[in-house]
Amino acid sequence: MFGGPGPGVLGAQGMAGPLRGRVEELKLPWWRESSPLVLRHSEAARLAADALLERGEAAYLRVISEERELPFLSALDVDYMTSHVRGGPELSEAQGQEASGPDRLSLLSEVTSGTYFPMASDIDPPDLDLGWPEVPQATGFSPTQAVVHFQRDKAKNIKDLLRFLFSQAHTVVAVVMDIFTDMELLCDLMEASSRRGVPVYLLLAQEHLRHFLEMCYKMDLNGEHLPNMRVRSTCGDTYCSKAGRRFTGQALEKFVLIDCEQVVAGSYSFTWLCSQAHTSMVLQLRGRIVEDFDREFRCLYAESQPVEGFCGGEDPLSPRALRPPPVALAFRPDVPSPTSSLPSSTSLSSIKQSPLMGRSSYLALPGGGDCSDTGVVSSSLGPARREASGQPSLHRQLSDPNHGSPPGLYRANLGKLGAYPWSQSSPALNHNSTSPLTLAVGSPLLPRSRPLLQFHRGAPALSRFPENGLPGSQEPSPLRGRWVPGTTLETVEEKEKKASPSQSRGQLDLLVPFPRAREVGDPDSGVTPNSGPLRPGEQAPEDRRLSPSQADSQLDLLSRALGTGGAPELGSLRPGDRALEDRRLSLNQSRGQSDLLMQYPKAQGSRVPLETNSSARPARRAPDERRQTLGHSQLDLITKFGPFRGEGPGPNGLPISSPARTAGAGSGDEKRLTLGHSKLDLITKYHQLHGARQGTEPGGPKGGHLNGGNSDLVRDEKRLTLGHSKLDLITKYNKSKFKQLRSRFES
């Protein structure tokens, strides 16, 4: 195999294993020929490791001696493997008595050959429910930039760098850490998640998770204090032996992802010693390399397990999905199991899929696929099943420190918190104490029961949000003092629509005395009272104006004011025509405000007959005619209403008795009909014009035939001015004055 030295050396090296032979070769000073690099699997190392897991350290040394190989495992490796090994299925008594030595190993291999590799599972990976941004295009296409920070450089402290990045985060903070015991860094993450609403994801190593929980005990924190933070545990790959014995490695990755734009990765751990005494280094990375860290975090999050007490909206006590049955029950003599010996099958790279992919299956380890040797209780077991299977719940372990627990996460620390010196001085940590804080608050790790309100991002959830804070209730709380007409919840937009008539009621009362004049039948108002009885589906005008519904808004007041204010007498229209016009006005509420004003002059001018004898109603056109102020301020009403000012018999539809009346019509005396604005100058002008008209016409006709002058016709030809002071509105009004527009309701 190795040529050159001599027969003795050749014989010794020919019988040695690959590692021993290479070491012996490198120890010879005169050996100048370099060996080619061989990347291959060592079968001797696999046999030795399997012997260590199955029969202990003595069997491991025996295999090393037989294979003429060096003891490649250190004492640290041996201790970790023997302390974290998990057992496989055992042979029956009959098979155990019949088989021994190689036959026993062969039987074990036949029984468990299908369990050497992970089994396919239908368990969905956890979702990044708090939100996860996409990698910006500028980051994905820009070149990689790296800045190195050494802990030895006191001017650029690594902890200060991390705290600064946490304070500047806007979209997401993702932390993958082995040990997390620094309280200041946890406070920075809590401030970012709670105060600024930045989603925070923590993936902590399973092996050292107990230290993070101890820190939370000292700070009296639980899952309720971290509503916008997800804490999960992760572990390394699982090594399986030929006989089914296996152990799980540690998660030693350490990096921080900020806003999917930059990454801080290195050897720094979130501990006080690393910030003050231990030396470490980190790399601050930007550019397209961030996409690789983004993908790696998604894969780690998909493999992670929830931490009891810090799982947020996910309850670890309730199973998310049923896991496969135990391996020993899945394989029977009559059930063939496929065997495979490909080295690549031991890799868990096949499960590395994005957790955002819905209903995607990935590979899980047989028997649950969890890191049970270190501790977090599997999410597939409920409280009753966990008690039956011999796994005491976290609450029982914390409430009973003397309770014997299996080797796991809470065995060394959380199960014996009462024995620690700091637990004697902290009422939140000493569970045996009867302090008011412990009795009232209980365990700070276990979450308190509260109703969970789930919101779907990107969807309008206002209409589904309960008024009284209970998810199952659809009734508004009577303590709020809010009146809701019905059992269904109202949106803010509907409430604004219902409140708009009542808010504009003050403007209508100041500027439009029409409804009350119509009710009382004031002879000086120029309005025909509705003397007939109301129909079954009709309300009084005042009730319509005060109704909070959308149908009785300002448009309803406008349509009814226009429909009755211009009628010269009660008998001018037949009952059928009156019903037809009321039906038309009711349809106008769905046509828009501009259509109401466009329809009014033409339709009213066509349906009001000319009266030659108006002596029967001498008091209908008295000097104190009320102005109809109908507050509309939209631009389309100004542009569309202007051309109708000079058409028909006039805006009010009053008869023109003789041509002599129009001869003396002056523009200075024409009264303007102001459309409802709450500005003080409009109200002042209204009262000034009202007082001036009463002063100039003290002897107006109170009875007899109306043929005494031009002032009556001047009062009848009123302009509908939409009092806007903007220059552009006036310009558009003058431009559209001569356009001929026709209403859609004109016959």
From Swiss-Prot:
InterPro entries: FAM83, SACK1. GO terms for biological process: signal transduction. Residues 697-707 have a biased composition (Gly residues). Signal peptide: none annotated. Changing D259A: Diffuse cytoplasmic localization, loss of localization along fibrous structures, possibly due to loss of interaction with CSNK1A1. GO terms for molecular function: protein kinase binding. Belongs to the FAM83 family. May play a role in MAPK signaling. May interact with RAF1. This is Protein FAM83C. It comes from Homo sapiens. The lineage of its organism: Eukaryota, Metazoa, Chordata, Craniata, Vertebrata.
